Amino acid sequence: MCLIVFSSLEDIKNESEYSFILLANRDEYYDRPTKSIHWWKEGYLAGKDLKAGGTWLGVSEDGRFAAVTNYREDPTVRESSRGDLVKNFLENQILAEDYLQTLNKQDYAGFNLLLRDSTGVHYLSNRGGDGTQINNGVNALGLSLIHI
């Protein structure tokens, strides 16, 4: 099971020494080809899904962060890879809140998306809700909706 645990301070613009703390585990099929964490030419640090070309977690040189987990449900086939959600956010300088508004959520199998930029930490799932900003506290995200 993919699991992300994170702690975020209410005022991340203050940028204290530890304004964002992350623990993450990716649980994927062993036979799915991947490349280990490395700097992409586009300027972010992430592993790479060699099957679909995206990534599940990454951070840019300027501190922007993105991660995605699957949403537990019967498998569905979609044209768009969930790994592109992370990749596209990190490759563009759009604000997290604006990026979430541009997504065609129905194009993807079930997902939970976590983004961080200069405006804060943002969460969106295509299996419930319109997305939300997470201002503080310790939160955990797995294969179901986050409870804030």
Question: Which positions does each model-derived feature cover?
Answer:
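A short linear-motif detector with a strong N-terminal bias
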Residues: 1, 35-37, 45-47, 90-94, ...
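Extreme N-terminal starter segment of soluble prokaryotic enzymes
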Residues: 1-2, 19
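Short beta-strand scaffold segments in enzyme catalytic cores
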Residues: 3-7, 55-59, 110-116, 122-123
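Intrinsically disordered, low-complexity boundary segments flanking structured domains
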Residues: 6-11, 53-56, 99-102, 130
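Glycine/small-residue-rich interface belts in oligomeric ring/scaffold proteins
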Residues: 10-85
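Internal, conserved structured core segments that host functional sites
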Residues: 64-143
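Conserved small/polar residues in nucleotide/adenosyl-binding loops
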Residues: 146-148
